[in-house]
Amino acid sequence: MGAGQSVCFPPISGPHHIGCTDVMEGHSLEGSLFRLFYPCQASEKCEQPLWIPRYEYSMGLADYLQYNKRWVGLLFNVGIGSCRLPVSWNGPFKAKESGYPLIILSHGLGGFRASYSAFCMELASRGFVVAAVEHRDQSAAATYFCKPTSQESSPAESLEEEWLPFRRIKEGEKEFHVRNPQVHQRVKECVRVLRILQDASAGKTVVNVFPGGLDLMTLKGSIDRNRVAVMGHSFGGATAVLALTQEVQFRCAIALDAWMFPLERDFYPKARGPVFFINVEKFQTVESVNLMKKICAQHEQSRIVTVLGAVHRSQTDFAFVTGNLIAKFFSSNSRGTLDPYESQEVMVRAILAFLQKHLDLKEDYDQWSSFIEGVGPSLIQGAPHYLSSL
């Protein structure tokens, strides 16, 4: 990282170089936008992508946090808009005959496709292909799609951007009636990205709206369709839980501090497992953990653990924002008593152990199997003591 970098990402510990590309498929709201992290070949020329893709995301982030969109958006853009990810932008994909396991990742409220880059980079360095979906249900800080400007079909020069802002709950609206349709749309978007990547791995042509990106044909034969997991944070955690039930190709789900509220009550008898709930100390409620326990009671391989000293945003990249000015906008909600780098390491190891077990990986991640049971640094099984009488 350069001296001016105001986001200091955790060091990568896996053996693979990491590539990264953006994929937009389709010319309508029903299409897909995601950021793909993957093992790549070493390359002498290595352009690094921006962490926050464009200025509009800085404005959207300020708006989501309920700051002045214009001025604080400008401040965010100046402070963190030039930060780059330590990966190879559109780096050459490293083919693997047996295929890489695939993870589809769903962001939380106010997130976007790069909000969990620390997790994505580390998992890609460990030999996973990770697709971070940018949802179009208006839960993202900002997002967009490219649509034709006229009735003519598809030349790139005839496309125009349509931006979708974050949608707030209006006065008098019942939040569940907004969030429940959103979580179902989110699942459809996750499944669509799964299908796109399976098509690419099968050698089918996938047209990327973005020019000059990674040729997805290079993924041919390199994704293991039998080893697929879904993962998400907060609203994305609920999305992952629902996606596991609705799409049988997902073999397991990882729910980081899942916000269970959007899921309808009659969903729980139908819920599938295994789900790995990784909570932080001070976000969950008794009711929310009770709902997680309903799923665990039905599926003996599902687990709940809590990371002590971590807070809700400890599981996002915003935990790694540094510098007095910008960090103030996140510090009250993104800094727990546990060092964010220690928190990240503990969670990654727990995730790897869970994935090894349930995707039948031939790795050494079982050295952290105890983490799945809440036995490890800063971990406890189940809920914190003040929620333990459930």
From Swiss-Prot:
GO terms for biological process: lipid catabolic process. GO terms for cellular component: cytoplasm; endoplasmic reticulum membrane. SUPFAM superfamilies: alpha/beta-Hydrolases (SSF53474). It is a lipid-anchor. GO terms for molecular function: 1-alkyl-2-acetylglycerophosphocholine esterase activity; platelet-activating factor acetyltransferase activity. Its EC number is 3.1.1.47, 2.3.1.149. The active site is at residues 234, 257, 312. It catalyses: a 1-O-alkyl-2-acetyl-sn-glycero-3-phosphocholine + H2O = a 1-O-alkyl-sn-glycero-3-phosphocholine + acetate + H(+); a 1-O-alkyl-2-acyl-sn-glycero-3-phosphocholine + H2O = a 1-O-alkyl-sn-glycero-3-phosphocholine + a fatty acid + H(+); 1-O-hexadecyl-2-acetyl-sn-glycero-3-phosphocholine + H2O = 1-O-hexadecyl-sn-glycero-3-phosphocholine + acetate + H(+); 1-O-hexadecyl-2-acetyl-sn-glycero-3-phosphocholine + a 1-O-(1Z-alkenyl)-sn-glycero-3-phosphoethanolamine = 1-O-(1Z-alkenyl)-2-acetyl-sn-glycero-3-phosphoethanolamine + 1-O-hexadecyl-sn-glycero-3-phosphocholine. It is found in: Cytoplasm; Membrane; Endoplasmic reticulum membrane. Keywords: Cytoplasm, Endoplasmic reticulum, Hydrolase, Lipid degradation, Lipid metabolism, Lipoprotein, Membrane, Myristate, Transferase. A lipid is attached at residue 2 (N-myristoyl glycine). It comes from the Eukaryota. Catalyzes the hydrolyze of the acetyl group at the sn-2 position of platelet-activating factor (PAF) and its analogs, leading to their inactivation. Hydrolyzes propionyl and butyroyl moieties approximately half as effectively as PAF. Also catalyzes transacetylation of the acetyl group from platelet-activating factor (PAF) to lysoplasmalogen and to sphingosine, producing plasmalogen analogs of PAF and N-acetylsphingosine (C2-ceramide) respectively. Has a marked selectivity for phospholipids with short acyl chains at the sn-2 position. Monomer. Belongs to the serine esterase family. This is Platelet-activating factor acetylhydrolase 2, cytoplasmic.
